[in-house]
A protein has these predicted regions:
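Extracytoplasmic copper-binding redox domains, predominantly the cupredoxin/blue-copper superfamily
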Residues: 17-255
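Sec-dependent bacterial lipoprotein signal peptides
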Residues: 1-15
Length: 255
């Protein structure tokens, strides 16, 4: 009789402990189920613009020729895109608001950013995307490619894409600048994804120009980042409805 009572008491204690252990899991589930904070509204009547030109100071290196003969599906000539300069203007510089937005939050666009593979090159060579936004990857070549991001702060993945296959859709959850992407099938194929938390970014075109629209008035740090030449930062203050020009230059060696 005594043994039965003790056994019953032991079961009651175990049941009570189990209930206590379950409580943190329920609390955690409730926290995970909470919706993301709403995007911070911006008054469109007050937004400002920052634009400018990025220059290369010095003698630009000649683009290296790429030998693509290992794959008959890669036709034509190809040149390295690590430093593209035309008339002193520097292309493929990622420009973004690095600091000054405070605790503002922004919704990722629903429309995807397209990354294409054509002529056994990635297009574009430098791409900007918001965290959580879809990147749609296409293959317009008559050969198989292998898309392989090698991030520091995001999840690494490696996926083959045969010709004429459906687009691959991916996203990156964390902010990361100059995230390298390569193709395991074609070692010369390289590009860079830039993942940011706000829509305030741009990539310089072949004339070195960029434009960032829709900024709320304030004090900001604008970062200019190049895959080989490094990063340059500038402070800028924009008033309501103001358009401010912020130019930048890079020297060989990232000076």
């Amino acid at each position: 009789m005594v043994v039965s009572v003790l056994a019953l008491c032991g079961l009651m204690v175990l049941a009570a402990c189990s209930k206590k252990e379950e409580q943190p899991s329920n609390t955690m589930a409730e926290q995970q189920a909470q919706p993301a904070p709403a995007a911070t509204p911006i008054d469109p009547a007050t937004v400002a613009t920052v634009n400018g030109t990025v220059k290369f100071d010095g003698t630009a290196p000649k683009p290296a020729k790429i030998d693509m003969s290992q794959d008959p599906g890669c036709k034509g000539t190809n040149e390295a895109e690590n430093i593209i300069v035309s008339g002193g203007d520097l292309a493929n510089v990622f420009v973004y608001v690095k600091d000054g937005l405070g605790n503002r939050t922004f919704d990722a666009p629903k429309d995807p950013i397209v990354l294409d593979q054509k002529g056994c090159q990635y297009h574009p060579h430098v791409l900007g995307v918001m965290a959580g936004q879809t990147v749609q990857i296409k293959n317009d070549d008559p050969t198989t490619h292998n898309i392989h991001p090698t991030p520091k702060d995001n999840r690494e993945w490696n996926e083959s894409q045969p010709p004429s296959s459906p687009a691959i859709e991916k996203n990156f959850a964390r902010e990361e600048i100059m995230l390298p992407v390569k193709c395991n099938q074609h070692p010369w194929m390289k590009m860079y994804v830039n993942v940011v938390k706000s829509p305030f970014y741009a990539v310089t075109d072949k004339t070195g120009k960029y434009e960032i629209k829709g900024l709320p008035p304030g004090d900001y740090t604008i970062a200019f980042v190049h895959e080989k030449l490094g990063e340059q930062d500038q402070k800028v203050t924009v008033a309501a409805k103001e358009t401010k020009t912020v130019d930048q230059s890079f020297k060989a060696g990232g000076e």
